Amino acid sequence: MPWSEVSPGHFQRPLGANEKFIKSIGDRAHPLGREHWSVTAQARFKTSDALQGGQERVPELHKAWKTMRFAHPSIASIANAETLDYYVPSPDGLEDWMQQTFFVVEEDTSSQQYIASLQPSPYLTAHYLVRTSELILHTAHWRTDGFGAMQLVNAFFEAFAGLDDRDPIDLPWGQEVARLVPSIEEVLDLPEEATPEIKAATAECMATLALTRGAVGVSYQGDLTTLPAGTHSVQGRLSQSETKAIEEACCTRGISLLSAVHASVAATTYAGASSEAKSKPYTSTMRFNLRPYVPEPYSSPAYASALYTGGYMVQVPATHSWTENVREYNSAYRRGLSKGFLRARREYALNVQELLKKNIAMDGPPPSEVDISSIDDAELLVRPVYHGKSGDVEILDVSIGVETLTRQLYCFVWTFRGQLGFNLVYNEAYYNLTTATVLLDTLKNVLLTELGIRDDRAI
């Protein structure tokens, strides 16, 4: 159902089934002051001499933030139990929203430390770290995904570089509602009632969830009673020469870079597993950006603040070699998503919601594998340089991640400015920095070694 005006300046639509099930997962951690799978996108930047730096640039950043809301109003929508609500702001309302959502951080803290302290918000929030010149966007996962979050980073810097003398208050507020995003169910024109074909496709997707049981996992701290703490991460980048060598090696072998990293993530999980677990199969997620599968204009960056993602679980046996795994992953990525998978998006989400309500306890240890998520070439999402009337804005590096409250680790991967980047996300209640660093070093070493770029296996 599309957005409708339920009272003057108040627009509303039902939460989509996928938004609702992702929201229910995130909301479970609210009593702990956290939100599972909340998305965090980062960009470190510098400006030319013509633009102000440090604390002096804050008023301009505020203007850019308000301008960005006009272009992407769904960053200010609020999710209730059954509906999404958006209110056209008055001048005072726009200022109040800015004060609630844009934060200037002057403390001497790293982005990783700061992200670990973030708490849930009804809105998408922005955080400017003055000392390191970093922008962090943080939001619940029901609002967007990794690709969309990076497109929103791009939208912010487009607004910042493109500022003029006009006050954002003077924009034609009320017209922005035409850009409120629809749900994936509406975009794909999915029926309310599932057909037999849709039910069959849903059953196939649901069946893959069982693959997480009895799978190999990384050894973790604590026991089943250990409560989660903050989310931390360890980041790394390969040099431009190493990245180029990896891309050339993948091209020669007829495989994608993502497939090679995925196989290396599997090997990393086995390396971090206990000796008793090393004979178990490895289960991970085949994640897909749905934007290439939806019609125009919904595939464009104008719909960045939308949850357009999907996936299913896959499993490889412990007896498989790296080469066998990379071939299997490459085939799956190349195959992409079927029409049946897309048509099952609503029914699948409804089925998962029902499963979550039952709160069925899993047999055996909880999943603790390293899983993978990729935004591919980040330069297709975030421009390296923005040219404006007052000067240029250069993006030095980017990163993407999520909050995790489970024993699962998530390896995010991308390329930017010719470098392959990694962000390994973990919960500090179950892993420490040393363990995470060793895992990421192992991943990089496996990737370089298996592709013949590094001859030894020393980290």
Curated annotation (Swiss-Prot):
Q: How is it used?
A: As colorants, MonAzPs are widely used in various food products for centuries. Moreover, MonAzPs also possess wide-ranging biological activities such as antibacterial activity, preventing hypertension, lowering cholesterol levels, causing hypolipidemic effects, and displaying antiobesity and antitumor activities.
Q: What is its EC number?
A: 2.3.1.-
What turns on this gene? Expression is positively regulated by the azaphilone pigments (MonAzPs) gene cluster-specific transcription regulator pigB.
List UniProt keywords, sorted A-Z. Pigment, Transferase
Q: What happens when the gene is disrupted?
A: Produces the angular tricyclic shunt intermediates monasfluol A and monasfluol B that retain the omega-1 alcohol.
Q: What class of enzyme is it?
A: transferase
* Pathway where it operates: Secondary metabolite biosynthesis
Q: Which domain of life is it from?
A: Eukaryota
Q: Which GO terms describe its molecular function?
A: pigment binding; transferase activity
InterPro entries noted in UniProt: CAT-like_dom_sf
Q: Quick check: keyword Transferase in the entry?
A: yes
Query: Does the record carry tRNA processing as a key word?
Result: no
Q: Its function?
A: Acetyltransferase; part of the gene cluster that mediates the biosynthesis of azaphilone pigments (MonAzPs), a complex mixture of compounds with a common azaphilone skeleton very widely used as food colorants. PigM and pigO are involved in the elimination of the omega-1 alcohol with pigM acting as an O-acetyltransferase that synthesizes the O-11 acetyl intermediate whereas pigO eliminates acetic acid to yield an intermediate with a C10(11) double bond.
Q: What family is it from?
A: Belongs to the trichothecene O-acetyltransferase family.
Could you tell me what this protein is called?
Acetyltransferase pigO
Q: Which organism is it from?
A: Monascus ruber (Mold)
Q: What is the lineage of its organism?
A: Eukaryota, Fungi, Dikarya, Ascomycota, Pezizomycotina
Gene symbol here is: pigO
